[in-house]
Amino acid sequence: MGKFYEIIKGETPTLVDFHATWCGPCKTLAPIIEQLKTKKGQSLRILKIDVDKNPAIAAQLGIRGVPTLIYYKNGKQLWRKSGVIPLRELETL
């Protein structure tokens, strides 16, 4: 968990994608996240966290459903949303 907090407190804004391998909407969101990664390049870090492999951090952050995306800048949560989010909305982060 220490590494997670180290990453989100870094200079590069971070979008955290909480997902699960069995989750249908997560599979729908995955190519959208890849498109965002391509468009934003080095200006945005994307961190993917499988909630089944990392249940402690998911519980600590109150992740109740997947996919859930959380946007951090300088360690502060600025945006949070669950479900499949359109690329247009993610580009505004």
Where are these regions (language model features)?
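Short pre-active-site segment immediately N-terminal to redox-active cysteine/selenocysteine motifs
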Residues: 11-12, 19-22, 65
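Non-catalytic, surface beta->alpha helical segment in thiol-disulfide oxidoreductase systems
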Residues: 70-93
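Typically the conserved alpha-helix immediately C-terminal to a functionally engaged Cys/Sec
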Residues: 27-40
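Structural microenvironment flanking redox-active thiols in thiol-disulfide oxidoreductases
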Residues: 51-58
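Structural micro-motif
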Residues: 61-70
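Hydrophobic beta-strand anchors of alpha/beta hydrolase catalytic cores
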Residues: 15-16, 46, 69
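A short beta-strand-turn-helix
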Residues: 1-13, 55
